[in-house]
Amino acid sequence: MKVKELIAMLNERDPEAIVLISGYETLGGTEVAEADLLIDMQSICLEQADNLTGNRKVVSSGGEDSVWLGWKDDYRTKVFLEDAQIPDQDE
């Protein structure tokens, strides 16, 4: 989804509504998180989508401009953001 597509979808919603993202490790649960991070990144499309790993991979360079929406208190956020910024970590 492009930013302009997300903006169009959000423009159809109550501007006072809270933006939620799926809670992780909550299989079948109703727990969610309030999104509070928006980070510029680059990503590439994966050849095969997987319902556990997604359909894109963050890369440090050479990808398409992307925006990551997250929650700062997720226990994996810090490591994810660090890994996404280290060039030699790309596979």
Regions found by a protein language model. Name each.
Residues 2-12:
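DNA replication sliding-clamp ring fold and its partner-interaction surfaces
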Residues 15-91:
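Detector for the mature cores of small, proteolytically processed
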